Amino acid sequence: MKILRNYLNNVKPSFVGEGRYSKWFPLFDAIENLFFSYTKKTKNPIHVRDAIDIQKVMVTVWLATFPAMFFGMYNVGANSLEYLDSINQQNTGDWHHYLISIVGYDSNSFFSKLWFGACYFLPIYFVVFTVGIAWEALFAIVRKHEINEGAFVSTVLFSLSCPPDLPLWQAAMGISFGLVIGKEIFGGTGKNFLNPALTGRAFLYFAYPAQISGDKVWVAGISDYNIIPEGYSGATALGVAAESGMSGITNSYTWMDAFLGNIPGSVGETSIIAILIGLIILLVTKVASWRIVAGTLVGMILMSSLLNIAGSDTNPMFAIPWYWHAVIGSFAFGLVFMATEPVSGSGTNTGRYIYGFVIGITVILIRVINPAFPEGMMLAILFANLLAPVIDHLVVMANVKKRKALFNE
């Protein structure tokens, strides 16, 4: 590394100031920070000194996704190999086969399941990451500022929220829309009012619904063979609930299956225990706000309980209790990694409770009341993103009035 450090020091003058390659400084700066810690220090005494910076925050979130990522790859392999065994096939029927065949299709092997899932997830992540960094670099060069690490988080969250069979070109389009429309046109990292990963996923959901919803996209291989053997279902637990309520869920899965993640779904959204590990990391490092988490849980429990009491003879979703809502769909993943994003969420402490409460109520209303969207977490968070500035404004104004009243007394 000393050789690389010396080389970067030697060529750095060409990239800074009026150097020959100064317009490419954002790329040089990104490469330097990739291999070496940020060395600039603020010496002026008026600045607050802290060991944390944007780079460390983004890396912490990125690492916090690893438990969900690795379990997700294993779960994709387990579900897909089970499906292939049920139709007596040992070939995915597409280009993934050439990668999977390196290890084989052994449904009894842990590593085989992990490798199978990796062969589906990693290409998606590679394409999303490459396209995302390319957009980040392009805007950094045009605006002449450093490349922020925000793309690291947006790309991994977007990839984990996708089904394993998502076409690579759609993955590229989704992250492009999310980063460009959801973040860069508003000024980049720190200035976006919508979560970029969710913005990209929402674009895919409405533009290409066949590839990101339904019963055939959550288990890799079903879309290739288009064969559903008798007694087999590739539907998610939330999809089953929307069709037949609690009886359908309990006949297909146990609560523990959903908690551990042994169910079909998006790559990173199935295992609640893996997501909770990530939540602990984010809370301990104070990257995520526990107030948003608490507000969302209270809102979700309250609204689902009210709908349980109200009941419905025609809508089976009314009967789903809160503890099932918490472990199915993308509720946990969205809460931990999307709702707690500090940029697009509320910034005041009181506002964070309200912001989370709005998400909790909205996700249940969309899931239960709206038959077109059995999964409501994505839309609930985006809706709360739009309200976050208003919430903070009202909280600040209320505090101003309170202080004025105290002063006048």
Named regions from a protein language model:
Residues G190-L276:
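Long hydrophobic alpha-helical segments that form multi-pass transmembrane helix bundles
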Residues V293-N349:
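A beta-strand-loop signature enriched in Asp, Gly, Thr, and Trp
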Residues E146-I227:
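Membrane-interface helix-loop-helix junctions at boundaries between adjacent transmembrane segments
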